[in-house]
Amino acid sequence: MRKYEALLLLSPELATDNRQEIVENLKGVLERQGTTMLSVDEWGMKDLAYPVQKKTRGHYTRFEFAAPATAIAEFERIVRITDGVMKFITVKLADKYVPEGA
């Protein structure tokens, strides 16, 4: 398994409950693919450097997880079709993930 980070930019028009629902759904997608969630950070509402989908603010959420390479394609497919996600990026953080105690 490799260690990844995904950064999501969510629409500022979403209610708090809707944002939490999107985050929980995406965590579920990752867990069904056999990933290990390391952290989920809510960065909150931030001003954007340039408009994205005609919006100047967005809510940032960061996922850090260890996953097999095959899980990333499914995760990104689901993120692309999820309403409320304006932008996202997934990057590989390290060559190999070693669980604690291994």
Curated annotation (Swiss-Prot):
> Which BP terms does GO give this entry?
translation
Q: Which UniProt keywords apply?
A: Ribonucleoprotein, Ribosomal protein, RNA-binding, rRNA-binding
Q: Name one Pfam family in it.
A: Ribosomal_S6
Protein origin, superkingdom: Bacteria
Q: Which GO terms describe its cellular component?
A: cytoplasm; ribonucleoprotein complex; ribosome
Asked if the keyword NAD belongs to this entry, the reply reads no
Return one GO MF term: small ribosomal subunit rRNA binding
What is this protein's function per UniProt?
Binds together with bS18 to 16S ribosomal RNA.
What PANTHER family would the database entry show? MITOCHONDRIAL 28S RIBOSOMAL PROTEIN S6 (PTHR21011), SMALL RIBOSOMAL SUBUNIT PROTEIN BS6M (PTHR21011:SF1)
As for family, the record states: Belongs to the bacterial ribosomal protein bS6 family.
Q: What is this protein called?
A: Small ribosomal subunit protein bS6
